[in-house]
Amino acid sequence: GYSSAASDVYKRQIYDKEYADKFKELGIEYFYTLIDDAVARVIRSEGGYIWACKNYDGDVMSDLLATAFGSLSMMTSVLVSPHGYFEYEAAHGTVQRHYYKHLKGEETSTNPIATIYAWTGALRKRGELDNIPALGEFADKLEEACIKTIENGEMTKDLALITTLPNPKTLNTQDFIKAVRATLDSLMA
């Protein structure tokens, strides 16, 4: 089928000519497998590999894995065009269910980490492209603030349900963002 034909072309025209020797030197192996086998390997695995997928397969499987091993709200995505354009985004989409609750005036505990990291990725890239190191430094500090806030036990509901930290403080969306801001302010001082 299409997948095995595409893999054969890749192996002959790209891998064998450009990467086979480099992989061998580094003790890395390349192999093609069908998506069902790849999924089974991932579920049993502890990592240590790169999994290249076609767009749809990669989209669905990365969402599945992020959810299975933590929270979809912790995963970002970067789209890179052949023309050198970059788009940073939260991989989870719009979280409509929470948005509709918000419209009704109901409190939500939506995890904004993926959206924050989409912004930090874009800021870091912009700083790189325009040679403005301060943008990258700010992005690094904001990401550090997110991590420290969670490590200090302040988190949204999705993380509070899976954390191993004792007595996590479950925050609504706005309070979590305020906590990240307070941590960022202390890091920037």
Residue ranges of model-derived segments:
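Single conserved hydrophobic/aromatic residue that forms the stacking wall/gate
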Residues: 1-6, 10
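Glycine-rich beta-alpha junction loops
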Residues: 4, 37, 56-58
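A glycine-rich helix N-cap at a beta->alpha junction
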Residues: 12-35
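Amphipathic alpha-helical segments that form well-ordered structural scaffolds
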Residues: 14-18, 118, 179
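Short, conserved loop-to-beta-strand elements that form functional interface hotspots
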Residues: 29-39, 163-165, 188
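A domain-level signal for the structural core that forms small-molecule/cofactor-binding pockets
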Residues: 39-40, 71-72, 79, 177, ...
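Glycine-rich phosphate/nucleotide-binding loop
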Residues: 42-141, 148-149
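Internal helix-turn-beta structural module
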Residues: 104-110, 125-188
